[in-house]
Amino acid sequence: MTVLLPQLNHIHKLPVVLNRRLRQSYRLPVISAVSGKELILSGKVRAVEPKEANAVVASEGYILLDVRPAWEREKARVKGSLHVPLFVEDPDNGPITLLKKWIHLGYIGLWTGQRFTMINDEFALRVVEAVPDKESKVLVVCGEGLRSLAAVSKLHGEGYKSLGWLTGGFNRVSEGDFPEIEGTEELRFATIGGVSFYLLKLLVLLPSFGQKSR
């Protein structure tokens, strides 16, 4: 089976590197994701296709761990899934952080609706509290597959050895792949926000307008 791993070159890069601290803050998730990719390719972590994910959870006893930020999960989520965000909104309003937030808003936030985030320092702790048995089967998922790769790397380092990774994240999920969905949006659209969200809505509505005008 060919495993489609998310490409790291789609991550937004800043046009100007302001200082070492700023550069390091954007590099950390990428390093973790590379480690997660190696775990997938080595077979230490199971790659699960969206079509088989529900069966893996229902029949094989996997716990579905959603690592998306809270605002993405509010839009759409799988009923009964465990939620521990890998990234949380950065509350710091210091000068350097405010500058980074402005850059983020101009290059990423307005278009995608993504907020300026930081690594959740309590991520591993919260997962261990919720799933203390490290022999448990855990299927890790995010919106597009990259953040869940970083989460897989962290959890493997914590001693979890029966990990799964949903290939491509919820973005690749089709209607019916998970029978019980909560929220106001489709799972595959929950990551999209900002201007992109409204353009997507327009594209979805255009075929309907075309049929009515005939």
From Swiss-Prot:
Annotated ranges, domain Rhodanese: 58-182
GO terms for biological process, alphabetical: response to cold
GO cellular component: chloroplast; chloroplast envelope; chloroplast thylakoid; membrane
Membrane topology: Single-pass membrane protein
Residues spanning the membrane: 190-206
Alphabetical keyword list: Membrane, Transmembrane, Transmembrane helix
Residues at the active site: C142
InterPro entries for this protein: Rhodanese-like_dom, Rhodanese-like_dom_sf, STR10
Subcellular localization, as worded in the UniProt entry: Membrane
Keyword Transmembrane on entry: yes
CDD domains: RHOD
Protein's recorded name: Rhodanese-like domain-containing protein 10
